[in-house]
């Protein structure tokens, strides 16, 4: 029935009549993927105690998901273009849901980390394919509004994850931060299987560039791991330098491979386009700043103020609301105000918010400042997505979405690694100077990015 509705709409040239309902289900699915970073971070102390995890295993509980999610994102985007976004969305959602069940049952670090890797694989398949569907189903001003809804859910998801993680950890226990994905995932899977239109493959015998996927995944993994190690050991180490060099060599090899492969993962010239390049820069900065907010706020509340996980989660509720509000308002205003102006406003707002706790460190100022910063970063998610994806061809929407989502994960890794290094003195001692320095760095980074956005972001078309 739903396919008949889609076919009639396609023949008449009208938009898909179920597009907003589809967006709702896709948005909730994306929300699960974003939640799975911060919801786990709050539960880590309990997981560590129950499974007797080493410090390295605790770190990998978060980074294994981020590494796999970010490293395989381009593969997911290319698969959506070749095999159809519907097929890849459903496959990724099924893998993520099953992996969540396995991870919740984990009784050892091996099963826990294996489940996290599998969750990352499912997320890497689903996220770019879902964003590709959003771009495909909506046009013009409606697309900007849809991206606003999408970004509000994704941007607010990280803050909501802190609240949900605190509630679940304090209630039924840490396994439920994973179990909660299972019933939600199954409902969304059944709904999308019925509502999403069938799509034809891009070619009679579609192929994936597996060597290219291996190169970009390994390079991305090496780079993200370098950031993680730098947060613990410092930048001036042989291991960190070797990982950065390995990543650079891998990316060069990837570019060379894309120019010779019969079925390349992406047209490398796509990143040379000003809108795409600017959009990826903006999404990287927005995510890095967002992670800085949650990292600094979470550890400040729990280490310096001795709040528990549930109290910390409740304190982040204003941040979640502000993030979603900033994204939603920006989605409504971008068609008239333009991406450049809103990019500058969003980053300036984030800089002001970060500066508040840097000047005066107190629970009230941290909540107020991070909420202001959250509104700014929420706006940035919309501007970045609209800038990078607004002018790509339909057959490129999957890989372009993959690029945007990849830099989203890169931003999370960079933000966590750099901020944790700057704030390290406050994580192991009683001083607040590390937290102050972290907020100062975030404020300066946002201000510099605002100046860069004023120059780099394309102006409104006339």
Descriptions of predicted regions:
Residues 194-195, 231, 452-456:
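Short, hydrophobic alpha-helical segments
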Residues 2-194, 328-330, 336-379, 383, ...:
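Transmembrane-helix bundle of Major Facilitator Superfamily
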Residues 174-214, 262, 272:
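Conserved aromatic/hydrophobic "specificity hotspots" at molecular recognition or selectivity sites
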Residues 80-87, 143-145, 202-208, 264-267, ...:
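Interfacial helix-loop-helix linkers and transmembrane-helix boundary segments
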């Amino acid at each position: 029935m739903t396919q008949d509705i889609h076919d009639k709409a396609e023949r008449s040239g009208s938009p898909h009549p179920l597009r907003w309902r589809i967006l709702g289900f896709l948005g909730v699915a994306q929300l699960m993927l974003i939640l799975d970073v911060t919801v786990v971070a709050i539960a880590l102390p309990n997981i560590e105690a129950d499974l007797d995890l080493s410090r390295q295993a605790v770190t990998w509980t978060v980074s294994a998901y981020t590494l796999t999610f970010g490293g395989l994102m381009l593969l997911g985007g290319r698969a959506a273009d070749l095999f159809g976004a519907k097929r890849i969305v459903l496959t990724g959602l099924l893998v993520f849901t099953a992996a969540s069940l396995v991870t919740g049952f984990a009784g050892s670090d091996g099963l826990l980390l294996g489940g996290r890797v599998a969750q990352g694989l499912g997320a890497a398949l689903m996220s770019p394919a879902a964003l590709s569907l959003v771009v495909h189903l909506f046009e013009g001003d409606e697309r900007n509004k849809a991206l606003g809804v999408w970004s509000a859910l994704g941007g607010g998801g990280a803050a909501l994850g802190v609240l949900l993680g605190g509630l679940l950890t304090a209630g039924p226990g840490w396994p439920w931060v994973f179990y909660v994905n299972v019933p939600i995932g199954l409902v969304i899977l059944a709904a999308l299987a019925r509502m999403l239109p069938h799509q034809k493959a891009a070619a009679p015998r579609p192929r994936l560039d597996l060597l290219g996927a291996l190169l970009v995944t390994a390079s991305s993994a090496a780079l993200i791991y370098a950031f993680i190690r730098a947060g613990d050991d410092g930048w001036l180490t042989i291991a960190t330098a070797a990982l950065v060099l390995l990543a650079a060599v891998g990316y060069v090899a990837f570019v060379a491979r894309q120019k010779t492969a019969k079925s390349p993962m992406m047209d490398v010239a796509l990143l040379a386009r000003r809108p795409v390049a600017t959009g990826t820069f903006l999404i990287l900065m927005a995510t890095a700043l967002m992670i800085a907010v949650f990292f600094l706020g979470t550890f400040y509340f729990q280490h310096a103020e001795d709040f528990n996980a549930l109290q910390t989660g409740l304190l982040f509720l204003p941040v979640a609301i502000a993030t979603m509000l900033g994204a939603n308002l920006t989605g409504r205003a971008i068609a008239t105000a333009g991406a450049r102006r809103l990019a500058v406003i969003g980053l300036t707002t984030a800089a002001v918010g970060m500066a508040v706790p840097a000047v005066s460190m107190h629970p009230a100022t941290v909540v107020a400042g991070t909420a202001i910063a959250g509104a700014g970063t929420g706006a940035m998610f919309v501007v970045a997505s609209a800038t990078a994806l607004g002018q790509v061809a339909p057959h490129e929407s999957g890989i372009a979405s993959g690029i945007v989502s990849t830099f989203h994960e890169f931003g999370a890794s960079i933000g966590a690694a750099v901020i944790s290094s700057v704030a390290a003195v406050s994580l192991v001692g009683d001083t607040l100077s590390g937290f102050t320095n972290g907020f100062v760095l975030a404020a300066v980074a946002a201000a510099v990015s605002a100046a860069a956005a004023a120059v780099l972001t394309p102006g409104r078309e006339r």
